[in-house]
Amino acid sequence: TNSVRDELPQGWQPWIINRTKTPTEYRLVRDPQTGVVVLHAHADAAASGLRQLLDVDSSQEPVVAWRWRVLDLIVSADNQDRYAEDSPVRLMLFFDGDKTTLPFKEQVLMDTAKLLTGQDLPYATLMYIWENRLPVGTILPSSFTSQVKMLVAGSGPDRRLGRWKQFERNYVDDYR
């Protein structure tokens, strides 16, 4: 893969989830299949990501579109097991809200996460994932918090592994 540049796209920032793990490496590359410049991520047991903070009116713009290419599955991943939750790709949407209205347990979890990571957790999260076995469209609640939902956007070692796959989802409907 031909490296175009090592710096992140404008407005994108590293998001470190677990400081004890090696962060994912990101760079912009020219995809040899399409010739398009894309963001390439290389991770080895990482717990990090990239984020871009946006202020979007979900009633006016309820659709998100993206594409990704999955080269390999994480064989040990099982998103129905809290100790094996993992995905080779994720698109996470964070939502604002009044955290004081959440149950006390959720508030304590968010406070603890801030102590460990140095960052505030969002009020709610919708995570689009590639899952090993579950069918596309499956919604998985997080086993850690009721404020996170995972939606299977791609699944299994299907014929699309190694190929670009495009998605367009109404995230407002998906989160309900």
Residues covered by each model-derived region:
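Extracellular carbohydrate-recognition regions
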Residues: T1-T20, F104-M110
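Secreted extracellular polysaccharide-interacting domains
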Residues: L39-E61, L73-S76, T145-S155
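Extracellular/luminal beta-rich ligand-recognition
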Residues: D86, D96-S146
